[in-house]
């Protein structure tokens, strides 16, 4: 983990929320094959070339899972105050029906899941509540594979854990559509 912390080109972009700029509450980095641009939260990310360590992780993961990943989003949670809000990884650049592999390194954190809100016109059911959500405690070295339907039906997020002082890295290997 120390090698990744030191060798990655970390950024803390700003996003527009209700007309105001806010720093993303974590550090991020985007790596991938040439042409694997990725837009989320209104930001366009150009891929940095794979480092040797990241390329080796990609190779090992691809062999183990029988999947071909061409991009990687890294999130660095410096302590328990860094977090990620509710979202689904459903951007049009992502290859449909391709799983996302999420590798956790460092401090344990709880990844929360809740049913994805449906448009009001389509849903006659009650809105999702906290009782409908669940958490997965992800420890150092855990690998979570989110198969394609996950993003269609669920949102996920990483809430703050304010007493936590240790760092956590999350590496999410993805497949971007190529032109």
Question: Predicted segment positions?
Answer:
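Non-heme Fe(II) oxygenase metal-center motifs and adjacent flexible, charged/small-residue loops
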Residues: 1-179
């Amino acid at each position: 983990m120390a090698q990744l912390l030191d060798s990655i080109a970390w950024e803390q972009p700003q996003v527009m929320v209700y007309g105001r700029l806010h720093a993303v509450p974590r550090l991020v980095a985007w790596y991938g094959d040439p042409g694997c641009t990725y837009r989320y939260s209104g930001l366009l990310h150009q891929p940095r070339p794979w480092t040797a360590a990241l390329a080796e992780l990609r190779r090992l993961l691809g062999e183990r899972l029988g999947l071909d990943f061409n991009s990687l989003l890294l999130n660095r949670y410096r302590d328990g105050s860094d977090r990620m809000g509710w979202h689904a990884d459903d951007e049009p650049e992502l290859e449909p029906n391709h799983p996302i592999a999420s590798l956790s390194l460092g401090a344990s954190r709880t990844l929360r899941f809740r049913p994805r809100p449906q448009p009001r016109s389509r849903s006659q059911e009650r809105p999702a509540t906290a009782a409908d959500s669940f958490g997965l405690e992800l420890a150092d070295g855990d690998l979570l594979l989110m198969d394609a339907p996950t993003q269609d039906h669920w949102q996920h997020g990483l809430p703050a854990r304010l007493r936590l002082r240790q760092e956590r890295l999350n590496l999410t290997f993805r497949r971007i559509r190529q032109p």
